[in-house]
Curated annotation (Swiss-Prot):
Classification via Gene3D superfamilies: 3.30.70.260, 3.40.50.1360
Organism from which the protein derives: Streptococcus uberis (strain ATCC BAA-854 / 0140J)
Pfam family, one: Rib_5-P_isom_A
Superkingdom to which the source organism belongs: Bacteria
Enzyme type, top EC level: isomerase
UniProt cross-references to PANTHER family, sorted A to Z: RIBOSE-5-PHOSPHATE ISOMERASE 3, CHLOROPLASTIC-RELATED
Gene: rpiA
The protein, known as: Ribose-5-phosphate isomerase A
Length: 226
């Protein structure tokens, strides 16, 4: 599995050119993309500026000597490469297994070319087997949890060392065990309108390419009408 993730990450790095502003994703597959960018910066003199999606990726990029800018300092990002937890046949996805969904979506939004790197196990017919992360403000989180429970969404707070996990932005995550999401756009719209929800892990209609590593090698899938 690690070898597949590395293949996908290294393949994605080939899309990075001199002078680009590059969004650096978070997670076990995006990690290899960031490592390869670091190698190219140091060994090939690649000239890029990175914008990170989590404190973990910031530390990784700094350790590799990749020049960084804050997202507030830029208007557009040329290319962002990130992982995904599930991708359906319509190129909608669930992200946020690494608890960085809010920053990931903020970086993805001004990106001209958005690429996901995954291993083939992440490609699914329908989203929902992977729990959907919902980032919520701490105030009123228990009430919101009960709302999700009554709706039958099987919520659970994301935990870390027996405490509720706190994201880089200071929020909680409620994971929804939905099994299947029949209408991802409608479900996203409902969450967007829910007071107390900061962001959710449905990334619908956002990605341009999905790089999939499998036993037969690497495939680059182009999203329709992108």
């Amino acid at each position: 599995m690690e070898a597949l993730k590395k293949m996908a990450g290294v393949t994605a790095a080939q899309y990075v050119k001199d002078g680009m502003i590059v969004g650096l994703g978070t997670g076990s597959t995006a990690y290899f993309f960031v490592e390869e960018i670091g190698r190219r910066v140091n060994e090939e003199g690649l000239q890029v500026v990175g914008v990170t999606t989590s404190s973990a990726t910031t530390k990784q990029a700094e350790s590799l000597g990749i020049p960084l800018k804050a997202v507030d300092e830029i208007d557009e990002i040329d290319l962002t490469v990130d992982g995904a937890d599930e991708v359906d046949k319509e190129f909608n996805g669930i992200k946020g297994g690494g608890a960085a969904l809010l920053m990931e979506k903020i970086v993805a939004t001004p990106t001209k070319e958005y690429i996901w790197v995954v291993d083939e196990s992440k490609m699914v017919e329908k989203l929902g087997a992977f729990k959907l992360p919902v980032e919520v403000v701490q105030y009123g989180a228990e009430r919101l949890f009960r709302v999700f429970e009554k709706a039958g969404y099987n919520p659970s707070f994301r935990m870390k060392e027996d405490q509720k996990l706190i994201t880089d932005m200071g929020n909680f995550i409620i994971d929804l065990d939905l099994k299947v999401i029949e209408k991802p756009f409608e479900f996203a719209e409902m969450l967007d309108k829910t007071v107390g929800v900061v962001e959710h892990g449905l990334f619908n209609g956002m990605v341009h390419k999905v790089i999939v590593a499998g036993k037969d090698g690497v495939k680059v899938l182009e999203a329709p009408s992108k």
